[in-house]
Amino acid sequence: MTQDVVTVSSQTAGTIKESGTHSNPDNKTTSPSTWKSLSKYACFDSEAERQWWNDSGALIARFLDIAKGDIHEQYQYLLFVREVVIPALGPYPPIRRCCINITEIGIELSLNYQGPGKPVFRVSLDPISEMSGTPMDPLNIDTVNDTVARLASIGLKDFDRTLHYHFMSEFCMPEEKAKTYQQDSREPMAWSQMILGFDFKDGNVVTKEYIWTRHAAHASGLHPHAIIRRAISRVDDQMRCSAAVNLVLEYMETFNADIPVPFFSWDLIDPSESRLKLYGIAWQWSWAKVEEVCTLGGKLQGPATDRSIGLLRKLWGILKLDEFTPSMAFTWNYEILPGQTHPNVRIYFAICDRSDEEVAQAVSQWFNLLGWHETARSYPETLRYLQPNRDLKKTNTAHTWLSITVTEKGVYTSLYYHPLGNGPDDHNIRKTWF
């Protein structure tokens, strides 16, 4: 990581102010009282932490305000962010070394709408330490391990490290191989192999973990799917998901053989309760590909699948995806619940290729289609509240992705956002992430 290290100079230090000082028409200031209160006597271990708190910390406080949790929950969540997330973000300005979003910054923010009520706020985190990317921790495994240990010490409700240890033992290569991985694989940068995710819901923090498969495949010489099958077989007595996993992998091997499952995720809870999500990507953007993914190449049929395809086709039209090809890869995941024989499908639409104002109007149109009329009406103003420093007619990265899952229980829409309130709006599209 030496080539990517960013030093905060004395000229930079102390110049970052809270991200947003305006008020919106509903008289909500862009600096919630929760953030101001926790900032008053805050002590940080470094100038970088202070600047992260003043930028992304203030932005996160606005997201928590949008999520409409009670004041006690907002304080608890912000304290978690300050104590766990902020220290794991590394230098400020940020190192551009992460593959969880188009900004290459190691934090991603999202809102999950499960109906017309309040959304669930979520954070994805690629922790950074002084060892990250160095020969001491080339694939960032030790740094993630330390963060998971810290989470365990906090005493999060239902937190369980069983699957963390299991999948780490199955996919993380020996230390000596890890030290030479970047050179041996000829990758331009040694991305982290594991990242974390947090859902702030019902007063609790639910933790998820993601792992990339190509590192283990390169080190072992095995196909990524062979390692996935082996790893799942060893915990299937608890997760009860092998039938659905095999269905997904067979589809991928038939229709997407050039790009095997690049990463997958699970919940850090008891394995018998954990979901498993297998991700796929393709550089082919077409409606035919969406239908193929949603039906597993024709193997998934029925009213629920038909409804999903019908709604996705309408969203495809709202986003005008017949008129241009997004610069990001087409992405999806298959979510498998314990005991489930067929997965739920989530489709991700890249929305960073047009103005944020245009995207906000499209999101409003989508919410109206679902009957969430108040959420639809307020969404453009919600975005201006979250990002008051952007001219939304000119910027195009306040949003990054929009994802949809349609199940028998309802329609779930997630929107993913730029993690900075003050930072530069530029981003580079890498086709070598996976």
Swiss-Prot record:
InterPro entries noted in UniProt: Aro_prenylTrfase, Aro_prenylTrfase_DMATS, DMATS-type_fun
Q: Enumerate the residues binding L-tryptophan.
A: E104, I105, E108
Keywords for the protein's UniProt record, in alphabetical order: Transferase
Q: Its Gene Ontology biological processes?
A: alkaloid metabolic process
Q: Where does substrate bind?
A: R122, K208, R275, K277, Y279, Y348
Enzyme nomenclature, EC number: 2.5.1.-
According to the record, the residues making up region (Disordered) are 1-35
The reply to whether Transferase figures as a keyword in the UniProt entry is yes
Pfam family name, one: Trp_DMAT
Q: Annotated pathway, please?
A: Secondary metabolite biosynthesis; Alkaloid biosynthesis; Mycotoxin biosynthesis
User: Bias regions of kind Polar residues — which residues?
Assistant: 1-14, 21-35
Does the entry feature the keyword Transferase, yes or no?
Answer: yes
Q: What is the top-level taxon of the source organism?
A: Eukaryota
Question: Which reaction does this enzyme catalyse, per its entry?
Answer: yaequinolone E + dimethylallyl diphosphate + H2O = [(1'E)-3'-hydroxy-3',7'-dimethylocta-1',6'-dien-1'-yl]-quinolinone B + diphosphate
- What EC class is this? transferase
Q: Name one GO molecular function term.
A: transferase activity, transferring alkyl or aryl (other than methyl) groups
The record's function comment reads: Prenyltransferase; part of the gene cluster that mediates the biosynthesis of penigequinolones, potent insecticidal alkaloids that contain a highly modified 10-carbon prenyl group. The first stage is catalyzed by the nonribosomal peptide synthetase penN that condenses anthranilic acid and O-methyl-L-tyrosine to produce 4'-methoxycyclopeptin. 4'-methoxycyclopeptin is then converted to 4'-methoxydehydrocyclopeptin by the ketoglutarate-dependent dioxygenase penM through dehydrogenation to form a double bond between C-alpha and C-beta of the O-methyltyrosine side chain.
Q: Which family does it belong to?
A: Belongs to the tryptophan dimethylallyltransferase family.
Question: NCBIfam families in the record, alphabetically?
Answer: arom_pren_DMATS
User: Which PANTHER family does its entry note?
Assistant: INDOLE PRENYLTRANSFERASE TDIB-RELATED (PTHR40627), PRENYLTRANSFERASE ASQH2-RELATED (PTHR40627:SF3)
Q: Which protein is depicted?
A: Prenyltransferase penG
- The species is Penicillium thymicola
